[in-house]
Regions:
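Selective transmembrane helix interface/packing segments
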Residues: 1-228
Length: 228
């Protein structure tokens, strides 16, 4: 049990990789460095996939990319509704980032989503976007008025909901990623080594992708709710 606690504390700890020598030294944590690696990998992949595109004679690579883009566009269009289509690029970016961040543990890196600061930042960005979407769709006056709907007595609850939504998104993503680690450690204690290895692949691949889907799906629903 002590080994489990020690392992959990180690997973929660985010090491400082280096410091930028300004303002007394700005610490750059492991989750930030891994995020930079993910950003660089996605940029290079987009650069590679975006080369030599043709309208008249599309190659197999272009057809595959267009199919993927169409799939994401159709999926998010159903979730967001007509008024929320402007936010598809954001949701597509987030699901790609979270998906890769959860899978990067297979390469020996510590997933950034195990750092609560990362999940909190993603949640705050999403909630800011949701409220901005509501203001754009309804106008400032109608947006403010919506807090008193369907009746003025629930105004405090609607205001509190603004802070509950990011907390829910943050803790759901962080909790599920951390929960998979706890389950894996418990499996290692009670079953042979080969069984945890199989479940490790499940949690790293399927559960990681599911959590990315759940995060953007809920964000999409919140955007649709805000814009209607």
């Amino acid at each position: 049990m002590y080994a489990l606690v020690d392992g959990l504390l180690e997973e929660l700890n985010c090491d400082v990789v280096f410091k930028i020598p300004i303002f007394g030294g700005i610490p750059i944590y492991e989750s930030v460095v891994v995020t930079w690696i993910i950003m660089a990998a996605v940029f290079l992949l987009c650069f590679f996939l975006g080369r030599n595109l043709s309208v008249e004679n599309p190659g197999r690579r272009q057809v595959a990319v267009e199919a993927g883009v169409k799939f994401l566009n159709d999926f998010f269009s159903e979730t967001l509704g007509e008024k929320g289509k402007d936010y598809i690029p954001y949701l597509a970016t987030v699901i790609i980032y979270i998906g890769i961040a959860n899978l990067i543990g297979l390469l020996g890196f510590k997933p950034p989503t195990k750092d609560m600061n990362v999940t909190a930042a993603l949640a705050v960005m999403s909630i800011v976007l949701i409220e901005v979407a509501g203001i754009r769709a309804k106008g400032t006056k109608r947006w403010l008025k919506s807090f008193a709907e369907p009746m003025p007595v629930i105004l405090p609850i609607n205001i509190l909901e603004i802070f509950i939504k990011p907390l829910s998104l943050c803790m759901r993503l962080f909790g599920n990623v951390l929960g998979s680690f706890v389950i894996m450690e418990l499996l290692k204690m009670v079953v042979p080594a080969i069984v945890p290895a199989v479940f490790s692949c499940y949690f790293d691949i399927f559960d990681g992708l599911i959590q990315a889907y759940v995060f953007v799906f809920l964000t999409g629903l919140f955007i649709k709710e805000a814009t209607e």
